[in-house]
Amino acid sequence: MESQQLSNYPNISHGSACASVTSKEVHTNQDPLDVSASKIQEYDKASTKANSQQTTTPASSAVPENLHHASPQPASVPPPQNGPYPQQCMMTQNQANPSGWSFYGHPSMIPYTPYQMSPMYFPPGPQSQFPQYPSSVGTPLSTPSPESGNTFTDSSSADSDMTSTKKYVRPPPMLTSPNDFPNWVKTYIKFLQNSNLGGIIPTVNGKPVRQITDDELTFLYNTFQIFAPSQFLPTWVKDILSVDYTDIMKILSKSIEKMQSDTQEANDIVTLANLQYNGSTPADAFETKVTNIIDRLNNNGIHINNKVACQLIMRGLSGEYKFLRYTRHRHLNMTVAELFLDIHAIYEEQQGSRNSKPNYRRNPSDEKNDSRSYTNTTKPKVIARNPQKTNNSKSKTARAHNVSTSNNSPSTDNDSISKSTTEPIQLNNKHDLHLGQKLTESTVNHTNHSDDELPGHLLLDSGASRTLIRSAHHIHSASSNPDINVVDAQKRNIPINAIGDLQFHFQDNTKTSIKVLHTPNIAYDLLSLNELAAVDITACFTKNVLERSDGTVLAPIVKYGDFYWVSKKYLLPSNISVPTINNVHTSESTRKYPYPFIHRMLAHANAQTIRYSLKNNTITYFNESDVDWSSAIDYQCPDCLIGKSTKHRHIKGSRLKYQNSYEPFQYLHTDIFGPVHNLPKSAPSYFISFTDETTKFRWVYPLHDRREDSILDVFTTILAFIKNQFQASVLVIQMDRGSEYTNRTLHKFLEKNGITPCYTTTADSRAHGVAERLNRTLLDDCRTQLQCSGLPNHLWFSAIEFSTIVRNSLASPKSKKSARQHAGLAGLDISTLLPFGQPVIVNDHNPNSKIHPRGIPGYALHPSRNSYGYIIYLPSLKKTVDTTNYVILQGKESRLDQFNYDALTFDEDLNRLTASYQSFIASNEIQQSDDLNIESDHDFQSDIELHPEQPRNVLSKAVSPTDSTPPSTHTEDSKRVSKTNIRAPREVDPNISESNILPSKKRSSTPQISNIESTGSGGMHKLNVPLLAPMSQSNTHESSHASKSKDFRHSDSYSENETNHTNVPISSTGGTNNKTVPQISDQETEKRIIHRSPSIDASPPENNSSHNIVPIKTPTTVSEQNTEESIIADLPLPDLPPESPTEFPDPFKELPPINSHQTNSSLGGIGDSNAYTTINSKKRSLEDNETEIKVSRDTWNTKNMRSLEPPRSKKRIHLIAAVKAVKSIKPIRTTLRYDEAITYNKDIKEKEKYIEAYHKEVNQLLKMNTWDTDKYYDRKEIDPKRVINSMFIFNRKRDGTHKARFVARGDIQHPDTYDSGMQSNTVHHYALMTSLSLALDNNYYITQLDISSAYLYADIKEELYIRPPPHLGMNDKLIRLKKSLYGLKQSGANWYETIKSYLIKQCGMEEVRGWSCVFKNSQVTICLFVDDMILFSKDLNANKKIITTLKKQYDTKIINLGESDNEIQYDILGLEIKYQRGKYMKLGMENSLTEKIPKLNVPLNPKGRKLSAPGQPGLYIDQDELEIDEDEYKEKVHEMQKLIGLASYVGYKFRFDLLYYINTLAQHILFPSRQVLDMTYELIQFMWDTRDKQLIWHKNKPTEPDNKLVAISDASYGNQPYYKSQIGNIYLLNGKVIGGKSTKASLTCTSTTEAEIHAISESVPLLNNLSHLVQELNKKPITKGLLTDSKSTISIIISNNEEKFRNRFFGTKAMRLRDEVSGNHLHVCYIETKKNIADVMTKPLPIKTFKLLTNKWIH
């Protein structure tokens, strides 16, 4: 057909592809891609095959036949006349032109016509002069069919001059995709080469061999347009053509570059994988070749680690280097550099360098001795390597040598052994190991083989031709001086002392003997398999036995490490008593002790120490001469190498070459410090430092995180700074291998800027010493500055920056210059510098009013980077400013002449001083103050974790509570205090006495309050005494905050929870003469304790009566009074003995000693040990002052610094970060897998029960039509994300039944296979407890049901497939689910919707709004928990009717119908309930705890004295840093999870009295210290001792017309870390405890009143929800009550005054609480602290108090 088509073109007078080429042209036009014939595409190969059938090249051709060209044929057919190209487009070939040009037209005749629309390719039209495809031809260069015989003859006269001609050139294929362009370019280049245009193709360097002509360029342009349509070109090609649409050469050049890069990577990988080295080339050249390849691959993103590189190198070693292949078995961490050290050592020995270098080789492994033999084809060879190295050796490379070779002696000739070096000796006994031993200094006695990998065994060696043994004990028929030459792998001689027989007695009672050689110079005893084979014994490594050819097993083989061993117990000992080898006898007394023996004897000390000790006779019994020191020089103790392993030593002055090689700012060191925890969000948590290698100039930058973009911004900033300010370019940056430095983003940035990253080696921080030392220095300075200034820790980076400025200006002792001078900068002008933390007054340029003060006190931090100002911290505004408008606050001394820091008083609490607020002292006095505060996000309780501050004993002796201070003393001391302001230090000076910490005598008038009523004992005691009483020495450890100056802001309401008795001197109302109140007795003082709440005032201003200073809600009607009395009447409160109104409990009787760890987590709180009174400090004390010494704020205010916020001091608390927010407890697996329950279960009876349960579950699954049984799917056909794994789980229930369940692995389910919005609801525990309580009060019947395989009743909407369990033998198949299988994410929600719909539609139930899974109708209440149902009804028939309806649809089992009138026992959701209708209900978990607690492996004391309380008051948890390894830490955390998990389960079920202890310990799950574990054990022990306790409910009195729902709240102020308070609530329904909660307050409270408000506000939402539930389930009216023991809180709730709140957070909370109380008709009542049962939720109590508060509701 092709011949016919071509015959239609008569106008073509030339052959279509008949150009020839000379041999010279063939060789010069070389392919730059070097594409071999094997790499040609399939269509090229097909073309080759087709062309090979045509006429071959004439024999006269000087060039071998080119399979890509066709030979010219005689012109037997006229040329075609009607071709697509006119005759004038053809060129006459008068030279070696490209083959087949006639198809593409004469290039000179085609003009360079630009594209009409854009410089892109468009298909040419029929009138275009550009070539087109012939419409009837498949390709533009179709080859004529061989059968047609139609050929074309080249008419060019130049063809006769050619030595060879080409066949028809096959064109490239059409480009069909941009992704195929790289492969297409290869074929296009091949096409150009075959067309005699190889010379114009760009070479590797991007330049062609010759210049392209215009004709060739036209041809190139036309052919590229034909075969590469524009729509299939890559973007980068289109970009080139958009600039110059004829620039095909640039496209080819760039394509070749891309292919060269890809080819180079492929070639490097192939070269690296096929490395070969045998020593024929220099080792340096081989190393350079390999390292260059690895570097190129690493730079191209192909990372080759040391392990892979070493394996590839060792795989190619041969000859003398072959043994290095096996080093990887003993040295897993070998680097490429270490491997090349071994290769260099062997190469040097081959080159004859033994005379100039020590005759030993580097040991491939410094950790183990190894002995292994390899087969040699020429002579027997035994490899024996026993690397030894002295401890004090300075050699960098230790090389393998056999033990008998001296360190400096030349190697022995391989062919013979010098007999002169061997002197025979007599064998004294059969245990003598010196049989024929050479008496040379290099001899080492191996009497002790404790270094063997497997002592008492022989190493099986397939490569050893002889058996060698070190001990003569098993040698039979021994003879000395054998004429045997044995060499090791390095062809060094191994001296042989004797030869004999080795006799075996195997376990089948057969005896065998082989020849054995004796030498003490090997590491292991070698048993040659070749010699065993000679006596018909082979080693079977599949069975690991020695056996005969007939299969008889002789002995087992032990695999230890990488080798196989046979026990020596099969060897027969020698029966030669005293054989005489020669007539030479060595006396026992002349034998020297071997050094290895002495080395081990003397605790592995080094040789130098041992020799020195022997010389000085510090070791007796033998002398230095009694030890053989010959091997001490090169001895390497394996135990020392392992036990004393250290990092490589850094050579002193090793960085001098960098300092000399680089100019300033060309070599930088950088490192990151952080994070610093417990800081506000606005403060940085990290900083990154930079140090210049040459000048030592330093920079620091703050960081809030370590993200890639944050690090990149800093690098961009510093590089631009160095470039612009110092006109330098950074060349190298040294850093560690942290992810912030090794990420791809930073790597590309450095590469783009031409910077070389220099990383440290793994775990080698010393190599990064410059940056590490800088960070350490800056942190030391930071701690010092913060300690000295007393500034808050969130300013820590300002201290770092201040230190950096100073350090850059200090001269180095070595260079005698500062970093600034090295950098060419001027010295630091100290007149512009202020001490860090210098008090200043800053001008307020924008005051609130014209009469507002213009000055704001602040603290100077450091000079500004961006201006000539100074960075100053303003505590009152809680921000820093950059300003020059400041005045230094100076004392008598200059700021530069030892500024007197002690002239300033620094208080601890920033929030209270700066917050201006309205407060009142009495109902008729309210004082206003200006407020300079602006709210910010600073958390001023944050702390920098730098180093622990050790507590100090402040007072040398305890202060007697009966001592007092005379008034005169106060006056004198007050005068002294007024002269010098005292700064409250972090650690109080032990020299401070009681007198000089008293407040100043000079005070402004303080109003005197009379008729103050105390509520210390729960009653009202009128105190007609002044507010401020004199201070006695007994209270010197308390704060003197009660006395205030003009602004008496801190006098607030008073409650009973106070122990800080404040007795200080006061001023009269109208004058300046101070008078003190006469002293009163301790008893009177205790009566007159006045309790203050510093932040929320509890006194109502609208009532001036002295009887209502602490208001309680006064009933206005008799009904209200009766309501409040009725709320408290039926509660299970303790019965207290009546007390006399004049008696007051001594608050100091059970007060624990002052503890320095008062801010740590406590199971006792801060002073919470009083049995009757909650002893909570109302004011925060200095954290580091264990005696709570406080300085009056008037001392601070004496210098008009009332608005200045004194910095606070805090002590670091060592906590793991995760401890601070433990949100959940990891569940503990209680089920068994299939293999555990059935396959490997050794308990036959249990196994049978599990098998029975398994078959029952399978039948149930098939019965429920869980999956599609008609079709099984191939795993390859299904989308993997729709495939869910499955498994069987087994467990034994509490009733003893064995359960099997087929579940899906929902934990690895893909998110696309379920709706995350669906919810799986279960009944809330409070709903269950409420239903049970109402059932008791209303004589309900309780029926318990269970629905079998509940989830399987719910259909599944999604298309999901599961893998059958592995034991079913269907590994490659899948089954499609139809039902909601257990374990799927959506199964619970599907079942909930299914059962909910059925209960509503079929059973006539409705779900209670707001309480999921609680359904009701007029007669029945249902609580649903997955497949468990609990029915409550007054009529049992109503329950039965529901059961009948359920059985119509579901397999419903009746667990307990509840029809008996006697006591009925239930097991409902883990609770063991005893219920007698109309009388009582008891809830417990005795059986469950009896079963579970012993399985926790807790050291119980079952027969010892039982614990009476779960914890001790006053006990604090020490939170020092844990020093345990990772495995032990994980083990202890896992143990804590189990223990606290069980305790939480029990506590929230019914043991509400344990919730405080559980909550406190749960916060320390990730801090499992010994103390925490002991406390946890104590809690579990108490649970064990009281496992029989039950929550007791009694039926409500029938006379009660209403339901009463009560919440009792309590709070323990500031007894948790970071001043957090513990809050607790107990909920009661009709006098029955139904729930409880104990938790740490989310907000930081500043007083007990705020804590109580927080506690009550937390209880109200749940109280309202429970109220709604009770009203839905029982239509009786409901009375709701809130009980608290804080009268100040009640006063705030019932008051309408909005000026009481100084804090907007608690003000908002209190205002909302007011609205909720009034809107929900809540009755707020007062309860005495001694009767507040919620007290157990907030603090540990003494045994007596704990029992008193709990014995009425749980016993």
UniProtKB/Swiss-Prot annotation:
Residues 299-401 are annotated as: RNA-binding. It is found in: Cytoplasm; Nucleus. Initially, virus-like particles (VLPs) are composed of the structural unprocessed proteins Gag and Gag-Pol, and also contain the host initiator methionine tRNA (tRNA(i)-Met) which serves as a primer for minus-strand DNA synthesis, and a dimer of genomic Ty RNA. Processing of the polyproteins occurs within the particle and proceeds by an ordered pathway, called maturation. First, the protease (PR) is released by autocatalytic cleavage of the Gag-Pol polyprotein yielding capsid protein p45 and a Pol-p154 precursor protein. Keywords: Aspartyl protease, ATP-binding, Cytoplasm, DNA integration, DNA recombination, DNA-binding, DNA-directed DNA polymerase, Endonuclease, Hydrolase, Magnesium, Metal-binding, Multifunctional enzyme, Nuclease, Nucleotide-binding, Nucleotidyltransferase, Nucleus, Protease, RNA-binding, RNA-directed DNA polymerase, Transferase, Transposable element, Transposition, Viral release from host cell, Virion maturation, Zinc, Zinc-finger. Mg(2+) 1 binds at residues 671, 736. Residues 1038-1053 have a biased composition (Basic and acidic residues). Residues 1338-1476 form the Reverse transcriptase Ty1/copia-type domain. GO terms for cellular component: cytoplasm; nucleus. The active site is at 461 (for protease activity). Its main location: cytoplasm. Pfam families: rve (PF00665), RVT_2 (PF07727), TYA (PF01021). Residues 583-640 are annotated as: Integrase-type zinc finger-like. The record marks 401-402, 582-583, 1217-1218 as: Cleavage. SUPFAM superfamilies: DNA/RNA polymerases, Ribonuclease H-like. Residues 153-165, 402-418, 960-969 have a biased composition (Low complexity). CDD domains: RNase_HI_RT_Ty1 (cd09272). Gene3D superfamilies: Ribonuclease H-like superfamily/Ribonuclease H. Residues 1-23, 48-60, 127-152, 1005-1015, 1054-1082, 1101-1111 have a biased composition (Polar residues). GO terms for biological process: DNA integration; DNA recombination; proteolysis; transposition; viral translational frameshifting. Its EC number is 3.4.23.-, 2.7.7.49, 2.7.7.7, 3.1.26.4. Residues 660-835 form the Integrase catalytic domain. Residues 1610-1752 form the RNase H Ty1/copia-type domain. Residues 1-88, 126-173, 352-421, 956-1087, 1092-1111, 1130-1171 are annotated as: Disordered. GO terms for molecular function: aspartic-type endopeptidase activity; ATP binding; DNA binding; DNA-directed DNA polymerase activity; RNA binding; RNA-directed DNA polymerase activity; RNA-DNA hybrid ribonuclease activity; zinc ion binding. This is Transposon Ty1-ML1 Gag-Pol polyprotein. It comes from Saccharomyces cerevisiae (strain ATCC 204508 / S288c). The gene is TY1B-ML1.
